[in-house]
C-alpha cells in the first residue's frame, strides 16, 4: 500500500513516457482529484477518475506479489518476502500494467485487450509463481516436506468440511462479480455478471470431467479449482463477449488448465507445487486463454473501445 501511494500509481497511470512507464506527476498521489472529472460513462480514464479508482487499482497491486508468494510463505524468510514485495512490483507489475492499462505501448500499438486484470494480475502472477516454484524446488528440494502448510493439508485432507469449501467458493464468485463490474463503467453490468457466472460454471464442469476421465474419480475440490480457473479467465473477456462464447471460453479454459495441471504433475514435478493448488494453473493459464478468447470472440464495438477502459 505504501509503495503504491509513493510511486506505484504514478508509474502505472502517470503521463506515459514513450509508452514504457508513467511519469512521477502523481507521486504521493499529488494532483489526483477526489471525484471523477469525466462525464462519459463508457470511459474510465484512470488519471482523472478520482481517489476511488486509486483504491480499486491498489487492490490489484497488493494482490499481485502476495499471490506469487502465497504457497511458499513458509519457505521464504520475512526479509526475503519484503524484498520481493518491494522489487517485483517496481520492475515487473508496475511497468507491465502501464503498458496495458496505462496507455502504454502495448495498448496503443498492438491494441492489447485486458478487461479486469487478466493479463496484468493473473498472467504475471502465474508466470512469476511458476519461475519461483522452479527456483525453490531446485534450491531447496526438501522444502515441501518441511513446510507447515503441507503438513497441515496432509492432516486435514480427510476432515475438511466441503460444505464450507463450496460456500467459500461461492462467496469468492460474488466478490469476483464486483471486481469485473467495477472494471467497466458502462450499462453492460448485467452482461458482465452473466458472462462471469457462465465462464466459471463452464470451467468447473470441464475441470471435473477431465479429472474424472483421467483418474476415474473426482471430488468437490475439482469443481472449486475449475470455478476459480473460470473466474480468472473471465477477468480477461467478460466485458467483450456474448454469453454463448463465455460458456465456451469457460469450458475450454477448464479443460486446458486441468489437462496441463495433470501433465505437469506427471512430467514436470519440479515445476509445480505438489500439495497446494498451483497459482500457475489455477490463475495464470486461464487468464492467458481468457485473453486470447477476448480477441477471438469479442464484437467490434467492444474491441474498438477496449483501449478506453483503463479501470
Where are these regions (language model features)?
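Hydrophobic alpha-helical transmembrane bundles of multi-pass membrane proteins
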Residues: 1-311
Amino acid at each position: 500500500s505504501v509503495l503504491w501511494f509513493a510511486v506505484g500509481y504514478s508509474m502505472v497511470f502517470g503521463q506515459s513516457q514513450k509508452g514504457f512507464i508513467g511519469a512521477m506527476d502523481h507521486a504521493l498521489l499529488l494532483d489526483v482529484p477526489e471525484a471523477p472529472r469525466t462525464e462519459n460513462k463508457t470511459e474510465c480514464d484512470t488519471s482523472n477518475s478520482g481517489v476511488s479508482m486509486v483504491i480499486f487499482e491498489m487492490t490489484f497491486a497488493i494482490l499481485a506479489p502476495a499471490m506469487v508468494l502465497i504457497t511458499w510463505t513458509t519457505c521464504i524468510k520475512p526479509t526475503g518476502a519484503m524484498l520481493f514485495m518491494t522489487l517485483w512490483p517496481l520492475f515487473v507489475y508496475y511497468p507491465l500494467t502501464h503498458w496495458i492499462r496505462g496507455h502504454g505501448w502495448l495498448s496503443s500499438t498492438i491494441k492489447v485487450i485486458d478487461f479486469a486484470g487478466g493479463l496484468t494480475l493473473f498472467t504475471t502472477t502465474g508466470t512469476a509463481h511458476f519461475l519461483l516454484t522452479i527456483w525453490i524446488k531446485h534450491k531447496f528440494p526438501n522444502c515441501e516436506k518441511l513446510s507447515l502448510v503441507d503438513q497441515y493439508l496432509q492432516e486435514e485432507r480427510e476432515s475438511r468440511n466441503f460444505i464450507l469449501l463450496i460456500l467459500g467458493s461461492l462467496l469468492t464468485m460474488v466478490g469476483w462479480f464486483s471486481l469485473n463490474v467495477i472494471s467497466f463503467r458502462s450499462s453492460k453490468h448485467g452482461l458482465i455478471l452473466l458472462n462471469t457466472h457462465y465462464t466459471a460454471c463452464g470451467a468447473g464442469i470441464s475441470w471435473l470431467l477431465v479429472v474424472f476421465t483421467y483418474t476415474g474419480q473426482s471430488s468437490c475440490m475439482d469443481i472449486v479449482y475449475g470455478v476459480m480457473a473460470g473466474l480468472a479467465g473471465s477477468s480477461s473477456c467478460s466485458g467483450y463477449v456474448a454469453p454463448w462464447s463465455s460458456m465456451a471460453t469457460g469450458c475450454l479454459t477448464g479443460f486446458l488448465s486441468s489437462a496441463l495441471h495433470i501433465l505437469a504433475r506427471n512430467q514436470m514435478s519440479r515445476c509445480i507445487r505438489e500439495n497446494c493448488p498451483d497459482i500457475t494453473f489455477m490463475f495464470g493459464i486461464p487468464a492467458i486463454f481468457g485473453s486470447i478468447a477476448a480477441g477471438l470472440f469479442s464484437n467490434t464495438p467492444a474491441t474498438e473501445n477496449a483501449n478506453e477502459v483503463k479501470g
